């Protein structure tokens, strides 16, 4: 399960090296003393101290409700762990006696910057890995990056995703997913890049499947963006990433309270929990660099379990976009520049480039499993010959010219 860890270092005379005992990083969520029996019976209870994020008042007002939704989307995952109202978002106002720089308050902060990113660092108790406070920073130009993703990845299947300025509802849904992802880090979760592989490529073209899952990957902690696999005519409308099955599983693993005195006393309970979640939807793999990925299943910006097919479908959509770039980015006004057209064309090329690397990783690739002694699994397995051959053919057909 992909949690950040904080090692407790043990120095003793009986050791020949420093012993590292890792603890996952997490908030202290416990039922109130008077609710513990109810909790252990399976009833939902409120934690003694919920996780509260304050949305700083410099955050543009049009995005606040979407950011609040992204933060509180995690409530469903905490309910799986037995807690209701475990995480809440509040808008920071001047009348509140809250200092955003005070370590006692977790704050989501907006920065007027050209940087296109967001992050969610936290402060830990080094003795236990307990998260004491977390902050989320998002820079203004993340909106520009989201706009490009939405248009390039979904513009051919939803008209509202075309144009220089997208509707607030569309951009707000994207801001919701960014906030949700960063909060995931603030809860202790690492990236899970294999999560997108757990959804079959062809299922991403199914309205029934996508409506039921309501996300593009089994985890919001993947770098799986919008559904570029869906084709015009498929009828797919659930195109955005949201919390998935892995996220529910990971939060329950890390935050369910067992009432035990020591970590050792919980080991068997946690092992049993893992044994009941062996489905591929709950797989975890650490992040890899997209340019030199070893395991082709765990990559950035990819979708589906068949890189060749997903990329071919994505390219078909890119081919539909290119002839319409001028129409989507200009109004016909005399003297208007082609700056936006250039920006969209560059985004198309960048998306195409991603598809190539997704396929390339299959050539000489190795599947890497998280194995332990006695589980009977192979740690390393070469990608099947047929998949490597299909990947090579894709590159010869789509990249190289003769």
PLM-predicted stretches and their roles:
Residues 58-86:
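Zn2+-dependent metallopeptidase catalytic core
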Residues 1-59, 77, 86, 92-145, ...:
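Auxiliary tRNA-acceptor-end handling modules of aminoacyl-tRNA synthetases
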Residues 39, 65, 147-148, 230-236:
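Short conserved micro-motifs at the rims of enzyme active sites and ligand-binding pockets
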Residues 196-402:
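Conserved catalytic/binding loops enriched for acidic/polar residues
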